[in-house]
Each structure stands twice: as structure tokens, then as C-alpha cells.
């Protein structure tokens, strides 16, 4: 219940190291459970999806470690990320859609805003990758506000099973953190009142960013 979750968050706040280790352990167990299932089943082609193709943070570490473990057991791993200057070389880079940093042209900012809600190129590139590589399963790590849920209809179209490792609270909290602009523990959105992200200025102290994040959450819940 809500009160229990609040007490749990308070307890974690007393020891951030413990919190980080706990979250890391949960995500690792979820990822490795996929590996174990695949290893015990048959050799498969696994599509790993993340925003970045380099070690930007914990989600990428889990993603790449999962891929390494799968490959060690004879499975083929295909990566799908956005383009970034820091990306590691990849044989699948031709399928990577543009990111907000690599996109060019006079309409860059407009496209960046549109693609925060729905990334048309990501959907197109995902479909081409699936046609060429024919993965057996997709394992998503990060995608919010970057790759976006635009890839979901494509994965469903080709009947690709999806595993989603949740690395943060973005599914239910526009600000990712269950905290408002003042740092107070907050669950006021309750899965549907996302305008409160704007009224509480939850996202990095910015009304504009909070409004965009809330709007994206409404859009995603309405169409996906």
C-alpha cells in the first residue's frame, strides 16, 4: 500500500548506498532471469533495447552485462539504441535512429519535441531491423522520452515477446523519482493525475519540463 511504500522510501533514504545496491540487485536478477530462461530453453536471437550504446549509467551496465552473458552461452545478441557521438562501434548501427544530439537541420528543436512523445524514425528502423534480423525476443531497458513506445506496435505486429526491465519509476511517475519539486516524497499523481507534476514543479525545478513530462505521460497512457 501507499503508506508502506513511503516508509520503504524513507528507510532507503537513510542509506543511499543500500538503496543503490538494492535497486541494482533487483535489475540484475530480472535481467539474469531472462538469461537463465533462454539458456535452459534453446539458442535464440535476443534484441536488447536501450537509449545508449555506451556505458552512460547503471541501466546500460545491466544491458551490456546481460548481452555478454547471453553471448557466452551461444545466443546471438542484437542491439537497438539511438545514435550518439559516444556510441561504441556496432554492426547494427545502420538501424540506430537519430538522437536529439545528432539530429541536424533547421527543424531540429521541433523534431526533438515531437520525438519526445513518438519517435517515427525509431519505429521505422525497428521494423527494418526485425525484418532483417528476425529476433526471437526483445528485452527493453531504457526508452522513455527517447526511443519512446513507438516501437511497441512494431514489436506486436511481428509477434515479438517483450521483457521490460524497469530501472526507475517512469512508468507511473513523470518525474521518475516519486518526489516533488521540493524533494518531498510524492505519489499525488496516483497513476492518472499527471498534471500535478506541473503544479508541483516536479521535474528539475522547471515548469516547462514538468509540463512536457506530464503531457508525455498522458499521451503514453492514452495510446499505449
Residue ranges and their predicted role:
Residues 73-137, 193-200:
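A conserved catalytic-core segment of Leloir-type glycosyltransferases
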Residues 128-146, 161-165:
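Short N-terminal targeting/anchoring amphipathic segment
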Residues 145-146, 166-176, 208:
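A short, histidine- and acid-enriched strand-loop-helix "catalytic/donor-clamping" loop
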Residues 34-86, 131-133, 148-151, 158-161:
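N-terminal subdomain of nucleotide-sugar transferases
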Residues 157, 170, 185-224:
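Membrane-proximal helix-turn-helix segments that form the acceptor-binding/catalytic region
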Amino acid at each position: 500500500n501507499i503508506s508502506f511504500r513511503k516508509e520503504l522510501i524513507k528507510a532507503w533514504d537513510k542509506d543511499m548506498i543500500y538503496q543503490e545496491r538494492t535497486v541494482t540487485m533487483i535489475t540484475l536478477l530480472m535481467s539474469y532471469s531472462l538469461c537463465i530462461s533462454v539458456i535452459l530453453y534453446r539458442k535464440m536471437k535476443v534484441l536488447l533495447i536501450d537509449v545508449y550504446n555506451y556505458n552512460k549509467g547503471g541501466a546500460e551496465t545491466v544491458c551490456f552485462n546481460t548481452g555478454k552473458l547471453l553471448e557466452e552461452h551461444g545466443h546471438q545478441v542484437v542491439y537497438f539504441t539511438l545514435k550518439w557521438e559516444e556510441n561504441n562501434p556496432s554492426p547494427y548501427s545502420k538501424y540506430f535512429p537519430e538522437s536529439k544530439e545528432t539530429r541536424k537541420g533547421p527543424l531540429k528543436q521541433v523534431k526533438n519535441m515531437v520525438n519526445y512523445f513518438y519517435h517515427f524514425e525509431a519505429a521505422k528502423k525497428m521494423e527494418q531491423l526485425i525484418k532483417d534480423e528476425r529476433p526471437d525476443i526483445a528485452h527493453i531497458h531504457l526508452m522513455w522520452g527517447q526511443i519512446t513506445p513507438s516501437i511497441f506496435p512494431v514489436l506486436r505486429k511481428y509477434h515479438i515477446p517483450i521483457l521490460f526491465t524497469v530501472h526507475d519509476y517512469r512508468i507511473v511517475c513523470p518525474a521518475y523519482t516519486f518526489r516533488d519539486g521540493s524533494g518531498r516524497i510524492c505519489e499525488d499523481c496516483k497513476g492518472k493525475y499527471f498534471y500535478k507534476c506541473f503544479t508541483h514543479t516536479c521535474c528539475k525545478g522547471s515548469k516547462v519540463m514538468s509540463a512536457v513530462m506530464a503531457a508525455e505521460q498522458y499521451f503514453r497512457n492514452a495510446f499505449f
